[in-house]
């Protein structure tokens, strides 16, 4: 690797520059850092969008874990995934296929001479989520996931026959989910083997891929829309595969129940659930969502999480460890811990587990014995920021990748007994777009809420001076079981909003996660109750205690449940405290909740079905006539056509009411976006309109000549008045 030039990615701290929407969107986005077996270097990918070329470029780099320097490994954007086979040997996915349109290829190469690799396999469809294990014979067993036909063959969209009719016919729900309409194809995990050749001959595909999921009727893995490689695992010896699937026997729109399945890599047996209703080891009364199966280093145990409730997606996750072949009840590990971890790894000796969990507005790492009793309290060994990935190094330390409110990429090493050991790289010291951002840009406070102390973040603007006053931005998060965390977001980034000339306050009210399950659960059938009280008390705390915040010219914004709360605030006394409101994809008409796709969510939140508990659905109705009569604050409504969680009719209904009531309002719509706005060009318009709207009514547009304006958007405005 010495033939490459290593580049330093450290830079001297400098005066912070305002983070503009353009900089937020075009700043390089890096993946997790994956170390090689020697622990000397780590590989990571980078992608970057340009508003000059209107294209995204991507490349792979190596990070020297000793010096923090990087070098480009390859500029080939078709390299989509990389897996280390040895200190220098790499297996990667080429997202194109020279022989099969719509297929992909597996290549083997060396990190020291990447361009000299060779094709080991041509796969007949699009696959991702590659995991691989070397066997004692030297063969490589691998798994990846793609789309499947009902008969188990891989689905290739480019080669599929286009139907003559666009009709869709359904006899059961789901009909649609998140942003897609369900069809007869589904996700499935496929297995394959790369056979090691003799002498100088390289690896080649041995036989055909095997579908490990399709033999189980109605199973699917990974489960869309957010499922991925964490939904399955390959044992270190390559013999077994574990995968998660929703319960095949239950209506998928009504239950969150899912099981962990175990199947031989060679598909010689049909996958069986280890925690299904008829499995001998299933813990009594545990019927909720299962997740994150991970094999132990010697492959004889499997760690995973499961929730208790079969209709509650935000129930507390509990860690379980299954012994392969055992018929005993699967034991929980630290089962009483009042946190909900969502990632797990075994230490190399198989005695300890490392888990990642939301905790007090962060995502931290904790360690615990693999056989810990239920009353054990896991120990945290990371602090600020939010961990997104972690890998063991040869010295038993962990290479951690994360982010914070002030950086979109942070790499460091840590150990359970020592905490953070060494900082290796951080984007705010690398990228000109994030130049000078740092921990001093944020603070936090607690205040007395409806029934307990509530946490809130404070994000300061560029060149903040506490002797001055800055208008308030009041951020309300979605979920509702979610939180504002010390982590980077390219969609709702409080620093980008603050740098228009505001102080952003982002509270974690009733319903928030990471502060104990009681706070999370307390929002059930209470959407406009305790959370609203918390927000009122937060506003009052800011008004009375933060002298540098101008609450007389404040604004509020929120998405999803946060959009609902903005709609609720519009008809409440708190709405008169703000100069402008921004509601993104929020529910407005109580009776429209039945049009969502994940019916378990609304039925659990409001304690019953739409017909049995109608009063509960209507209790917190922003569209109630008496509330509409209070609407007065200028409001931007954002809603997109492919949002099937909260259909676009919700936003249109709200806009219609605002217009007819004479409230200054604007409707922003994206026909090709879902619950989120992710296309870079659309994201720029989203930021220009949202920031331009609040700047207009807060007065920032006049006080800050560099502030974003509604006129910055090149899209024409339709106005027949």
Swiss-Prot record:
Gene3D superfamilies: alpha/beta hydrolase, TolB, C-terminal domain
Pfam families documented for this protein: PD40 (PF07676), Peptidase_S9 (PF00326)
Keywords: Glycoprotein, Hydrolase, Protease, Secreted, Serine protease, Signal
Tissues in which the UniProt entry reports expression: Expressed in mycelia and conidia.
InterPro entries: 6-blade_b-propeller_TolB-like, AB_hydrolase_fold, PD40, Peptidase_S9_cat
Modification comment: N-glycosylated.
pH-activity profile: Optimum pH is 6.5.
Subcellular location: Secreted
Signal peptide, first to last residue: 1-18
Enzyme Commission code: 3.4.14.-
Chief location of this protein within or outside the cell: secreted
Gene Ontology MF, one: serine-type endopeptidase activity
Entries under PANTHER family matching the protein: DIPEPTIDYL-PEPTIDASE 5-RELATED (PTHR42776:SF11), SERINE PEPTIDASE S9 FAMILY MEMBER (PTHR42776)
Family: Belongs to the peptidase S9C family.
GO biological process, one term: proteolysis
KW Hydrolase (keyword) present: yes
Function description: May be involved in metabolism of dipeptides or may affect host defense mechanisms. Has a substrate specificity limited to the hydrolysis of X-Ala, His-Ser, and Ser-Tyr dipeptides at a neutral pH optimum.
Glycosylation sites (chain numbering): 75, 94, 151, 254, 380, 450, 607
Annotated spans, Disordered: 271-297
Name recorded for this polypeptide: Dipeptidyl-peptidase 5
Coiled coil: none
Active site: 560 (charge relay system), 643 (charge relay system), 675 (charge relay system)
Assigned GO CC terms: extracellular region
